[in-house]
């Protein structure tokens, strides 16, 4: 059983970003919160919206930072420090250029080119040992097109594929919390759209 106490969904705040690929982490967190009937509420001391859920008797905090993506670590560090949550007890969901839409994968630690993840690493004392949920949004092909791609809205087909991966990721997060990472990975990593 994974000892996750905080689940974070990354995105940019505001209605203009709500439906962009860069907010796939927020989409996941909203889906998880809806599944557990736990509305996210503004919490200024944590620079975001928070909720509490219980899975298999475990008390878990949900956090959507309302800072911009590249300042996500401010919110994560504030909540983690307040509740004495270690990096190894955190799951961070975010958009991943290197995976196609419809694919989501867990990864423990390591580096990332995702700005929100990099800021979390920096704010957590350069500790990279938190669990990541990488939600595929696809790569536009050339690095000069990345910003427009992540800040753009997915096509209807891409959106359906991303939502399918998120639905499966919510189910697998339950497996992660009730059983273990290996079982959750095996199921999530074999998901096909």
Curated annotation (Swiss-Prot):
Q: Which reaction does it catalyse?
A: an N-acyl-L-alpha-aminoacyl-tRNA + H2O = an N-acyl-L-amino acid + a tRNA + H(+)
State the Gene3D superfamilies in the record.
Peptidyl-tRNA hydrolase (3.40.50.1470)
> Per UniProt, which keywords does this protein have?
Cytoplasm, Hydrolase, RNA-binding, tRNA-binding
Location of the protein in the cell: Cytoplasm
Q: Where is this site: Stabilizes the basic form of H active site to accept a proton?
A: 95
Alphabetical list of Pfam families matching this protein: Pept_tRNA_hydro
Site feature location: Discriminates between blocked and unblocked aminoacyl-tRNA:
12
Q: What is its EC number?
A: 3.1.1.29
Listed under GO biological process in this entry are:
protein quality control for misfolded or incompletely synthesized proteins; rescue of stalled ribosome
Report the protein's function.
Hydrolyzes ribosome-free peptidyl-tRNAs (with 1 or more amino acids incorporated), which drop off the ribosome during protein synthesis, or as a result of ribosome stalling.
Subunit architecture: Monomer.
Q: What is this protein called?
A: Peptidyl-tRNA hydrolase
């Amino acid at each position: 059983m994974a000892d996750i106490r905080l689940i974070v969904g990354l995105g940019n705040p505001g209605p203009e970003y709500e439906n962009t690929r860069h907010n796939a982490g927020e989409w996941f967190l909203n889906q998880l919160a809806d599944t557990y009937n736990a509305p996210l509420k503004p919490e200024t001391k944590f620079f975001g919206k928070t909720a509490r859920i219980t899975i298999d008797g475990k008390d878990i905090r949900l956090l959507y930072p309302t800072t911009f993506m590249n300042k996500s670590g401010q919110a994560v560090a504030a909540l983690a420090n307040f509740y004495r949550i270690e990096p190894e007890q955190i799951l961070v969901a975010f958009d991943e250029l290197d995976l196609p839409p419809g694919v989501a994968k867990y990864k423990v630690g390591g580096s990332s080119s995702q700005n929100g993840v990099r800021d979390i690493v920096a704010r957590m004392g350069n500790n990279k040992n938190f669990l990541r949920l990488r939600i595929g949004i696809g790569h536009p092909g050339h690095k000069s097109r990345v910003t427009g791609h992540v800040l753009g809205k997915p096509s209807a087909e891409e959106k359906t594929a991303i939502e399918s991966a998120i639905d499966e990721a919510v189910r697998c997060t339950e497996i992660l919390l009730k059983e273990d990472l290996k079982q959750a990975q095996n199921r999530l990593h074999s998901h096909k759209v």
